[in-house]
Amino acid sequence: MVAPVPPGAPRPNSQQNSGPPNFYPGSQGNSNALADNMQNLSLNRPPPMMPGSGPRPPPPFGQSPQPFPQQSPSYGAPQRGPSPMSRPGPPAGMARPGGPPPVSQPAGFQSNVPLNRPTGPPSRQPSFGSRPSMPGGPVAQPAASSSGFPAFGPSGSVAAGPPPGSRPMAFGSPPPVGSGMSMPPSGMIGGPVSNGHQMVGSGGFPRGTQFPGAAVTTPQAPYVRPPSAPYARTPPQPLGSHSLSGNPPLTPFTAPSMPPPATFPGAPHGRPAVSGLPYGPPSAQVAPPLGFPGQMQPPRYGMGPLPNQSMTNIPTAMGQPGATVPGPSRIDPNQIPRPGSSSSPTVFETRQSNQANPPPPATSDYVVRDTGNCSPRYMRCTINQIPCTVDLLSTSGMQLALMVQPLALSHPSEEPIQVVDFGEGGPVRCSRCKGYINPFMKFIDQGRKFICNFCGYTDETPRDYHCNLGPDGRRRDVDERPELCRGTVEFVATKEYMVRDPMPAVYFFLIDVSMNAIQTGATAAACNAIQQVLSDLPEGPRTFVGIATFDSTIHFYNLKRALQQPLMLIVPDVQDVYTPLETDVVVQLSECRQHLELLLDSIPTMFQESKIPESAFGAAVKAAFLAMKSKGGKLMVFQSILCSVGVGALSSREAEGRANMSAGEKEAHKLLQPADKTLKTMAIEFAEYQVCVDIFITTQAYVDMASISVIPRTTGGQVYCYYPFSALSDPPKLYNDLKWNITRPQGFEAVMRVRCSQGIQVQEYSGNFCKRIPTDIDLPAHDDKLQDGAECAFQCALLYTTIYGERRIRVTTLSLSCTNMLSNLFRAADLDSQFACMLKQAANEIPSKALPLVKEQATNSCINALYAYRKFCATVTSSGQLILPEALKLFPLYTLALTKSVGLRTDGRIDDRSFWINYVSSLSTPLAIPLVYPRMISVHDLDVKDTEGSVLPPPIPLSSEHISNEGVYFLENGEDGLLFVGESVDSDILQKLFAVSSAAEIPNQFVLQQYDNQLSKKFNDAVNEIRRQRCSYLRIKLCKKGEPSGMLFLSYMVEDRTASGPSYVEFLVQVHRQIQLKMN
C-alpha cells in the first residue's frame, strides 16, 4: 500500500524523494441504431502488439530509485507499497529537509552517472524535483511548485502561431505560422512555481508550465502553440515507435531507422501505465503502418496509395440509400477502436541517429534517457514533425502546440537534472535573441564562434568557454558539459537575474470560522490538516508562517515567542482592510512552532458557539496579502460559504440564473464568468508581489466558483473542491491535498519565457499565470516557410527561486525536424497532446459561447483532421469506408467523451461546471484523457482474476453493456473515484468488501477499509496504485443502482446513447457522414 507522507516526513528532493501523499490517520445505448449512408469503418493500423507489451507502473513514490543497468536493464516485478493496513493511514514518516544544498561549479558532466532520482538537495542538482495545470515572453509566477500534476507553476500551454501572412484560424483549426520567433509574455507575474499543472501554448492547450502571480506550486504545464510555418531539416525517419513485446525488465524505446515504424499501443489512463491495465487489442486484424517516404519525396496531395498501407473493414448495417450491403448487418462494438493495453516499462531515448524520437503515450510507463532533447514530461508537441508551411498545417486540420511543464515529476529511475554554474558571467546566451546555450547550437571556426539555432545569428564564443572542435565538427568536451548534451539543464542565476534578494519561503493559512464551517466540521478538518503538515515545511531561518481566521470580521494572531500564548488581533473593517503589527503576524517557523500548534488546537473550540453566518472572504484574502506583501509566498485559504460581506462580496447568482436564464445560452455567458472585476484586480496585484493563492473549498452550498477561482488562476495557484463536504470522508483527502501542495518540489518568484526558431511565433498562451508584458523582444524578419530537412527548436526558460533561497534557471529545449509531407504529419501526431489542446480550448470557450456551439467546434476539429487524412493520405477510393490514421484512431472516442463531460452538460451545478473549467485550465497532458474518458475496473472478481503481475486489472469499456447487476465496479477520472454496487451482488462479496450482507446496509458516507481477506486487500491495493499514478488522493463515492448516485455513475458511460449525445457507434457514423459530405 502506498501511503501519503505523514507529518515529519521529508520533503521531495530531501533525503528521500517521494510522490504525492496517498493516505490519511445513463441509459443503455443501442449499438445497432445507426444512421444511414455508411458502409464500412476502416482503420489503418500497425501490426498488433505482442502480448504483455505495455508499460508497467514505476516503483511507488518514496522508494529508492533504480539505477539504469549497464546493459540489459531489468525493471523487476511491479513494486507494491507497504504492507496492508486495516484502513488507510498517514504515510510513512520521512525526515524534513535541513538547509539549502550546496551548489558547486560542475567541472564536467559524467556520462556514466547512474540514472537515479536525487535523494536530497544535491550539490549539483536543483533544489527541487523536476516534476502539476504557459509561456511566450517571460511569464511571472508568484510561486512554482513541482506538483503531481503535469505543468509548471500553474498549468498552462503556449500555442505557437503560423508564419506571417496566415489568416486567423477558427476554433479547432491549426494556428497559422507566424514569422519570427516569439517568446512567452514577458509580463507573467512571478511567484511560487510548482510542477502541478501544465501550460499550453498556441497550437494546443495542454497543462503546462505557468507563471503564477505569486508563489509557484507545481501546477500543470502550459502549452505553447508553435506557428505553422517552421523551417525544416533533413526529414526525420519514420515516426512511430516500434511495438514493445515480451516482458523485459526495461524495453529500450527507439524510433526505427527504416520504415515502417509501428505506433505506440494505446496507453492506460494512469499517469504511469499499469501492467495489464489497458484494453486488449481490437479483434480486427490490422496492417502495419506506412513507412516514411524518402527525404526528397514531394508532397503526395491526392496521389495514389502509399506503400504498405492497409485498412480493416468493419461492416455496418447502413449503406448508401438503395444500396445492398453484403455481409453482417451490424457494427461489432468489440471491433471499434478503444484504448489498448501495454504493460512493459520502456526506456525512451529522446534522440537517436541525430533526430528526435517520437515520445511514448503520456499515460504510459517510461523512463527517459535525455540524449539531447528534453523529456516529454517537460515539453511535448502536438505534432512531432513541424510542417514547413502554414498551408500544410492548415490542410492537416491539426493543432500545432507545445505542452510545457518544466517542473513535472520525473520517474524515480531517471537521471536528475544537472545544475551548471558559469560563475559571475552567467550562462552563455545568444547576444541577439537571448536564447540559452543548448545541444543544437553549432560551433564553427575552430570553436571560436557559434550559430544560434533560434535566430541564426553567428556569435562569438566567450574566451573562457572556448574548446577546439573534433574531426566530427563537435566540441571535444560536448559529453562533459550537460548544457551541450542534455535537453534539460539548470543554470545558477547571477545577480543580473535578481531584482531583489531571493524571497524567503512564506506559508500563510487563512481559515473560515463562520457558523457553517464550524457546524460542518470544515474548520476542524482544516486545522487538523495544517497541524499535521507543519513538520513537512522546510526547516531553517528562511521559513516563515502566518495564520488568520475570518467570518464577518478578520482575526490575525500574534505568534511571537515572547508571548505566553497567541494573541488575537481583530480587524472589523472589511471594506478598507489593513494588517495590524505586520512583523508579528508573519514570523519564522522556528520561533512560533509551539504557539502555532496550540492555536490550531484551540481554533475549533474558540468559535464553536459562533452564530455568525456571513463570510468576508475577499477582505480576508486582501488582508492576508497585505501581511505577506513585503516577502511574497503561498497563501492557502480554506473557505466554506459564499463571500457575502466586505471587499468582493458576492450574491447567489445560481438561483437567479436558474429562474431567469436559458441554461443553453445566457447561463454560459453570465454564471460561468466572474461577477465583476474586483477579485481579478486584486489577483493581479497579488501576482505582482509574488503571492500565490490556493483555495480549498469545503462547502455544502453554492460559493460562486466562477468568481473566486479567478484568484488562483491569475496567481498560479489551484482550486481544491470538496462538495458536498463530509466531516467523515473528506478530511483524509483534504490532508493529502494540502500535504502534496506543500511538500512537492516548488519554488518562488517564477518567470517563464518560450523561444522558437525563426519562422514560428507563439500565438497564444493558456494556463494559470499572469502576463505582464505581451512581448519583450524585437525579432528580426522571418520567413514564412521552413526548409524541408532542417530542424525547428523550442526552448522554455524558467527563472525561479528554490525553497532554499537559490536563484535558478531551468532551461528545456526541444528540436524537431521539419517536413513538407502531409502523411508525415499524421504519422507524427501526438494524440495525448492533440486532445489536451482541444480540451483546454473547449474549456476556454464555455463561459462565452452557447454549449451547442462549443460541442460543434470540438466535433468539427476532429472531423477536419480525419477528413484531411481521408482526402490526401488514404489509399482507399471507396467513400463507404471510414479511414482513421493509426495515431489518431481514438480521436473520435475522446471527442465524443468531451461533448458529454461535466463542463459541457446543462444539467449540473454551476459550481461543478466552473470547477471543471478551472481544473482543465491547468490540467497536465497525462490527466487530460482520463478526465473525460475515465478508467473503469471490475472489483467483484479481483481475487480470481489473473492480472499478470499487475495490481490493476484491465479496464472495461465505458458502456452499460459491460455492467452487471451482480457486479461491483470502480471508476476513476484522476480526481474522484466512484464505487458502483449492483442490486444483486452476492452477499459473500459484500461481506468481504464492506462487512455487510446486503447493498442496502452500506452507508452512503463510505470510507474505504481493508478487511482480512484477499478481495479486500486487492481492492485496497488497486485504489492505492491508482492514487499513486494520479498523484492524488481520490475521494471515493458510493453509487447504488436505482439512486441518484447510481445515475451519476451511469452518466460516465460515454459509449452509451444518452440525453447529452449519441452512442460511440452512432458518433462514428456521424463523423463518417460529415467526411463524405466534405468529400462530395
UniProtKB/Swiss-Prot annotation:
Q: Where is the composition biased (Low complexity)?
A: 71-84, 142-160, 178-189
The tissues where this chain's protein is expressed are given as:
Mainly expressed at low levels in pollen, leaves, roots and stems.
InterPro entries linked: ADF-H/Gelsolin-like_dom_sf, Gelsolin-like_dom, Gelsolin-like_dom_sf, Sec23/24_helical_dom, Sec23/24_helical_dom_sf, Sec23/24_trunk_dom, Sec23_24_beta_S, SEC23_SEC24_subfamily
Annotated Gene Ontology cellular component terms: COPII vesicle coat; endoplasmic reticulum membrane; Golgi membrane
Q: Where is the composition biased (Pro residues)?
A: 1-10, 45-70
On subunit structure and binding partners, the annotation says: Component of the coat protein complex II (COPII), composed of at least five proteins: the Sec23/24 complex, the Sec13/31 complex and Sar1.
Name of the molecule in the record: Protein transport protein SEC24 C
